[in-house]
């Protein structure tokens, strides 16, 4: 090539680089070895399993050990089919420009893992930088993208700093507790969420003239596995704890005589939705509420009852107007 042609080629390549989305991230299916390492990792989730967690996840009345759960998780890993991999690749390609806009928030690589029923009943979730899908992808592409973006928020949230995560949760009024003191019998009934890095957050709502600090808390009911209830999600019972905030943001359950310590969702839904928005009923944790709103943001929803949540989230993530 002549010097002129080389110069023209360089200019054209430069223009193409500006025209294409600057996506640094890789989205791909995990290898078997990567998947095993991720689902059996001794992360905060596996280190903090409760007796209820082990019983219902292992489907064993007497419970078990984290080592047994790791073995169950590993055995439940399933290879992707060519058709499934093609659908995931096509989804990423369709969303390349949007994903490029998130590059500052995401890890360099996001992995896709296919899990069976032995991994938390097949419920999609995340671990580390991986999205763990269930045994089957949603049939409709729109549903797949909604699920993908919901789970991608968890990867984003996990990758960011605690201060940035606090800032995200603060968009809907949640504040961190430096420590939480709960009765052992209550803590032992808790169901851990692998998507949540830190469950210790409260939101202040109107308690009928006085502010009340609420903490969403997922419990197991019953708290031990029952063969008559083989479905993992059928054990979920969400409650809201009445929390007292003390010095240096220490938190504890209110136990004063004549004061309600634990609320049902129905008892607090009005003031709660006034604070966090009514776009989703997924209020197990600020993380899950924001994940749904993030998915709505990324899929272009504009018909939600509280678009202010979407607007705040877009601004915080520095995304362009939809």
Model-derived segments and spans:
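Boundary at the C-terminal end of the N-terminal hydrophobic targeting segment
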Residues: 19-24
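N-terminal mature-domain "stem" immediately C-terminal to a signal peptide or N-terminal signal-anchor/transmembrane
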Residues: 25-85
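Catalytic Zn2+-binding segment of zinc metalloproteases
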Residues: 152-169
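Active-site scaffold of zinc-dependent metalloenzymes
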Residues: 115-149, 158
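Bacterial N-terminal signal peptides that target proteins for export
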Residues: 1-10
